[in-house]
C-alpha cells in the first residue's frame, strides 16, 4: 500500500499544480477579455490655452457592475491651488481623481479642463497634461534611471538625475552598489515603500505636467521617509493644479480648498479653517483623528 501511495504522490501533486495553473489562467484571461472588450475612448479636440482649472459639473458615475459611486458631484479645482478630497471610505474620492483624467467616461454631467469637455479631448493629449502619483507605483525590472525616464522618454541622463534629486532619490541611490544604474528588480522589489514613492515623484518632476493627481502615499511610511516625500511633494506641486486624495487630515491643513465627499455627493467644501469653524463632517473627521492620535501617544 505504501509503495502504491508513494508512486501516486508525484503524479497527484503535478495534477494539483496544473489545476491551480489552469484556474489562474482562466482569471487572467477574464481580465484580458475585460480590457479588450472595453470601448475605445474617442476625442479629437486639441486643448486651447485657457488654463488648467478642473471643473466637475453635476457628475454622476456608476461602474459596469451597476454600483453607483457618484450621484451629483460639483466643484472646481483651480490652477495654482491645492484641492484636497477627503471623506469616509467609499465616499468616491479615488473615483473622482481618476475621472478627472478620464480613466472612465461619466454617465451624466460634465468634467472640463481649461473650459474644455474632457470627453471631447484626444485621450493621449489629455493624459499628457497629468502627472499621476498614486499609492500603487508600477516599477519595472530595470535601473533607477530607466524607471524614472518613463516620465519623459526623451530626457537625457542629466535631466533624469536632476528630477531624481528634486524627489530625494539620490539619498538612497548613492548607497546602492551601482548607483543610478542599479537594477531595482521586478516592480521595485529591491526597494522600500518610501523609495518606490520617491521614484514615482521623480517621474512627475521629469514630466513637468501642469496638473498633478496625488494620492497621499505616506500613511504607512516611517517618519524619515514621510518627511522626505512631503518635502519632495511641496516642490512638485508649486504653481500646478493639484487634486489630492487625503487620508489624514493633518496633511491637508495647508490646502487651499477641502472637498468633503460622502455617499457619492459633496457634503461640504471650503478652506480648512472655514470647515473647522462650520463644525460639520470635516471638523468631525479632524476631531476623530486627533483623538485617535492622542490615544496612541498615551
Feature map (PLM): residue ranges:
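Membrane-water interface of transmembrane alpha-helices in multipass transporters/channels
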Residues: 1-2
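Generic structural signal for alpha-helix termini and adjacent loop/cap motifs
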Residues: 18, 38-39, 278, 288
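Pre-NBD coupling/linker segments of ABC/ABC-like ATPases
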Residues: 36-49, 275
